[in-house]
């Protein structure tokens, strides 16, 4: 975990989005490198904010952090550790992103996958980024594969070799895609 990276990112987040009082305090604690579960609990108690309400806001903060770190299209080991740290601090459980912020994660993943698939080929580094995205959003292989299928289908329609796209289509899906693609060319 790199508190300096978190500090810089959360300074940017504070400038970018309008935060409630308690979220401003929590961001300040991150920026001042004094964040802990206890300090979060204290802020929530002092501001009379129920944790279940705050959890949704915490998820939004983490998503903003993820968007910030993905601006360079790379997820470093340190950045992944920072995401894990934030999940622990905010008591985020597996499935919370998908349940509470499905639209946000879909938009973030779609944006990254669109960029990854734009050249109709998935490099080893891009395949690892897909795995990293799956991991930081706590998605199953099938969930991530379903997101990837959308972009991979576009690449296949453009003539890409499916073997170079790091995606799994069922036999039926693949041949439907191939048939539809050939049908459009006639």
Where are each of the predicted segments found?
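Small-residue-enriched hydrophobic alpha-helices in membranes
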Residues: 1-186
């Amino acid at each position: 975990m790199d508190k300096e990276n978190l500090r810089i990112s959360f300074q940017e987040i504070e400038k970018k989005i309008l935060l409630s009082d308690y979220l401003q305090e929590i961001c300040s604690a991150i920026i001042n490198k004094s964040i802990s579960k206890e300090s979060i609990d204290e802020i929530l108690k002092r501001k009379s904010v129920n944790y279940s309400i705050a959890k949704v806001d915490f998820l939004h903060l983490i998503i903003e952090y993820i968007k910030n770190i993905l601006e360079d299209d790379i997820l470093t080991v340190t950045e992944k550790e920072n995401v894990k740290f934030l999940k622990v601090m905010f008591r985020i459980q597996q499935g919370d992103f998908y349940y509470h912020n499905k639209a946000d994660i879909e938009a973030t993943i779609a944006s990254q996958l669109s960029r990854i698939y734009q050249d109709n080929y998935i490099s080893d580094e891009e395949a690892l980024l897909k795995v990293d995205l799956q991991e930081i959003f706590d998605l199953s292989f099938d969930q991530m594969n379903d997101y990837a299928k959308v972009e991979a289908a576009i690449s296949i329609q453009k003539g890409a070799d499916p073997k170079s796209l790091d995606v799994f289509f069922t036999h039926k899906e693949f041949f439907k895609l191939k048939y539809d693609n050939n049908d459009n060319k006639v």
